[in-house]
Amino acid sequence: MPNNYKEMKVGQIQTLKVARISDFGLYLSDEEGQEVLLPNRFVSLTNAIGDEIEVFVYHDSEDRLVATTDRPLITEGRVASLKVVDKNIHGAFLDWGISGKDLFLPNRNQQGGVLAGRSYVVWLYVDNITGRCVATMKLKPFIDNDIITVKPRQKVDILIASESPIGYRAIINSRHWGMIYKNQIFRPVRVGDSLEGWVRRITDDNRID
């Protein structure tokens, strides 16, 4: 398989330049000269050769590398709470905000199975062999507190991952685990919520509150 997915940064939002126009849409080019199609349904009448367009690159339902101006709910190397919209014997399919294409969550990447209509916290990665975007519920390889990249009083992105008697376990900046104690919560929250917060303290053993 050609390595276009590596050059085009599959799974990420990026700015590409209009290289040429076809009957099917616009061909967008990156700095390496790699091209990807932006289908007509995402093309504006004002787009012209040389214009720069912010797009998300992925494989469509026919396994073609394409671009879209849709804004995904998750990108490569990030976590999000996504709803299961369908299932089959191979896995589940998640709504990730891309029209006409659901995000695949293979059975091997699930923990305890999933139910249609329920939302689950997942990480998005690009498969090294196929170049496709894939979801996983197994977060341990990606979320850790070995090397802390935040500091006290820093503003951070928070995803509520689970609830305990003392508070909520949260994922910070899609990188670290943290704890929000119930006496530090001043608004209703539930598992799957994304919000902004601040780091209160970091303990000697790298626990983040």
Descriptions of predicted regions:
Residues 1-209:
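Single-stranded RNA-binding regions, centering on S1/OB-family and related RNA-binding modules
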